[in-house]
A protein has these predicted regions:
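FAD-binding subdomain of flavoenzyme oxidoreductases
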Residues: 2-147
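Terminal amphipathic helices with adjacent charged low-complexity linkers/tails
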Residues: 144-167
Length: 167
């Protein structure tokens, strides 16, 4: 896999802008992405609802650099193993109680070359789930986001965002 070592204080947009130049993306867009840092995502074990496949930061962290009261812990990038506990996993979601995360090696993905946005009306939640399955099958699971919103929420969008059409 492709990976990058990243400092914990980088904000989501800055990280994606740096990756864009290399044709890569993290494909991790949680709701507070614009205003939060990588270290915070790891410390809180963040999950992004603006994603369809890689929804938790766990899916992206390959190794960590953490400062503890005992000193620096720098894990190595190693393949997944069933040979006992993984020390990195202890720090995911620890909220700073075990140490301060200073950096991480992150799993990256090729940036999509084509971007399409669709606003589709479906008759039921079951139909929306079927639609997502069809989209994922047609794109090789490359769809980066899929949201289901209620009619009430749609009415708010139509009332407050000019030039938005009712699907």
């Amino acid at each position: 896999s492709q990976a990058a070592r990243v400092q914990a204080g980088v904000l989501g947009p800055d990280l994606e802008n740096q990756l864009r130049a290399s044709g890569l993306t993290m494909r991790f867009f949680l709701q507070a992405w614009e205003f939060s840092s990588l270290g915070g995502w790891i410390a809180t074990r963040a999950a992004g609802h603006f994603a369809t496949v890689y929804t938790q930061i766990d899916d992206h962290v390959e190794s960590l650099r953490v400062v503890t009261p005992e000193g620096l812990i720098a894990s190595r990038r190693v393949p997944a193993s069933g040979a006992g506990p993984n020390p990195d996993r202890l720090f995911l979601g620890s909220e700073g109680t075990l140490g301060i995360i200073t950096g991480a090696a992150l799993r990256l993905f090729p940036r999509p070359t084509d971007v399409t946005t669709a606003f589709v009306a479906v008759p039921s939640v079951a139909a929306a789930i079927d639609l997502l399955s069809e989209i994922q099958a047609a794109t090789g699971e490359q769809a980066s986001a899929f949201e289901l919103i209620s009619r009430f929420a749609l009415e708010l969008v139509l009332d407050h965002i000019p030039n938005t059409r009712d699907p």
